Amino acid sequence: MAMQMNSVVHVSTSPSPSPATSPPPEGKQEHGEVAAVHVVGVGDDEAVMVVKDEEAFGGGGVDYSGRAQWLRAAVLGANDGLVSVASLMIGVGAVSESGRAMLVSGVAGLVAGACSMAIGEFVSVYAQYDIEVAAARRRRRQRRRRCDGDGEEEGSGRLPSPFKAAAASALAFTVGALLPLLAGGFVRPWAPRVAAVCAATSAALAGFGALGAALGGASPARSAARVLLGGWAAMAACYGVLRLFANLY
């Protein structure tokens, strides 16, 4: 993991002779540019600025924060589809040996889950969209009051797209849900069918966990084991509860 180093620079706020002759903030420069400077406090005589530079100080590495939101949504959607449909098929298989019943239950889980994920993501991201639009309008009004209408307006940042988020979430859920359906939905004997669903789900869970960790800069082995154990627990719980329900009723 790249090491992040911060340095605090005290810069006088008194007028300088000219912008061209004013020295840059003290700190390491790379390719003629100073590291990112963020003002964290302003006093009467000086401003305190925090200089954050991950690459100029030799840290290097890749910044994963920009893709964190979409990566999280994709991994969660695929895992939800995989575990939900696999657990549903195994639970139905616990009370019925019919291959058709398992297949129909899996397809129903795929459709219902994809719609639920898409609607939930749409509502969540649209709420975030409304909040960011309202905050941007407040900033523009405050800026116009400070500058008496003479200052330049802030450009609008990149706002989240509710439709793209909903489509991505539904697609990720569908991809995950198709794996147990294709693995065991068309196998006729009961025992091989359940074994195929469990094997395909286990392999996919480990793969999704390792892939998400690798793209996010974490440990693939630890993430794969964590996701795999969680999937096994969900499938075992679904099988046990439905088996108990079938024996009681």
UniProtKB/Swiss-Prot annotation:
Compositional bias segments (type: Pro residues): 16-26
Vacuolar topological intervals: 96-102, 188-193, 248-249
The organism's place on the tree of life at top rank: Eukaryota
Positions of transmembrane segments: 75-95, 103-123, 167-187, 194-214, 227-247
Catalyzed reactions per annotation: Fe(2+)(in) = Fe(2+)(out)
GO cellular component: a single term: vacuolar membrane
Cytoplasmic side: 1-74, 124-166, 215-226
GO molecular function: iron ion transmembrane transporter activity; manganese ion transmembrane transporter activity
Record's keyword annotation contains S-adenosyl-L-methionine: no
Keyword vocabulary terms for this entry: Ion transport, Iron, Iron transport, Membrane, Transmembrane, Transmembrane helix, Transport, Vacuole
Lipid bilayer topology: Multi-pass membrane protein
InterPro entries linked: Ccc1_fam (IPR008217)
Main location: membrane
Pfam families in the record: VIT1 (PF01988)
Chain spans, region Disordered: 1-32
Biological process terms in GO annotation: intracellular manganese ion homeostasis
Compartments in which it is found: Vacuole membrane
Function: Probable vacuolar iron transporter that may be involved in the regulation of iron distribution throughout the plant.
Similarity remark: Belongs to the CCC1 family.
Name the record gives this protein: Vacuolar iron transporter homolog 3
